[in-house]
């Protein structure tokens, strides 16, 4: 049975989340998901378009995960709760893929740049909604998201060399700063 584009994209995204984006080649990916490289090209037109679609699909999944996190009693506890979610699957792998795309220089150039910017806007909106659920005032939530998103991304990168327990104090310091912004 032939897969439609959406099902194929889900399977390729699952494969890339498990095996990584760096060194992605069409033939091995096609074989792993039970199709041919020609079918991937038929559905996605190029390797670049496939990679862009995979990164976007992983971002969609990450956004759904953030939307499912219950609001916390305070912005501080919300930052710590979000950090805990960053360390769990599937969110951790989605963030890893974004890091890999950035590390390979994909996100900073077309055809990825426009898709990455659009995806980042939706990601930031999901974080704004989350922090509003945690009590952040509307007029300050964008500032909180800018700080927290960039910092947690950095902490996530640090997980490659540091243990979560080693980073938790820095994350809580970040959470205190975000709470201070929220309370003005």
What is the predicted function of each stretch?
Residues 7, 11, 15-49, 53:
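Helix-turn-helix
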Residues 11-19, 64-65, 97-104, 151-158:
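Solvent-exposed, amphipathic alpha-helical segments
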Residues 45-49, 53, 70, 103-110, ...:
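Residues in soluble alpha-helical coiled-coils and helical-bundle/repeat scaffolds
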Residues 53, 64-95, 144-148:
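Hydrophobic alpha-helical connector segments
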Residues 92, 109-118, 132-184:
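Hydrophobic/aromatic-rich alpha-helical bundle segments in the mid-to-C-terminal region
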């Amino acid at each position: 049975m032939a897969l439609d584009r959406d099902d194929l994209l889900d399977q390729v995204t699952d494969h890339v989340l498990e095996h990584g984006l760096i060194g992605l080649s069409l033939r091995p990916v096609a074989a792993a998901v039970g199709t041919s490289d020609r079918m991937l090209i038929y559905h996605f037109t190029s390797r670049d378009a496939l990679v862009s679609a995979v990164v976007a699909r992983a971002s969609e999944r990450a956004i759904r995960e953030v939307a499912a996190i219950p609001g916390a009693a305070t912005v501080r506890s919300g930052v710590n709760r979000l950090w805990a979610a960053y360390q769990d699957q599937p969110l951790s792998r989605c963030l890893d893929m974004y890091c890999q795309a950035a590390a390979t220089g994909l996100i900073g150039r077309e055809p990825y740049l426009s898709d990455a910017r659009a995806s980042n806007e939706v990601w930031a909106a999901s974080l704004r909604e989350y922090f509003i659920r945690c009590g952040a005032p509307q007029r300050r939530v964008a500032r909180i998201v800018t700080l927290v998103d960039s910092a947690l991304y950095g902490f996530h990168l640090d997980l490659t060399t540091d243990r979560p327990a080693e980073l938790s104090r820095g994350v809580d310091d970040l959470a205190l700063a975000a709470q201070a912004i929220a309370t003005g």
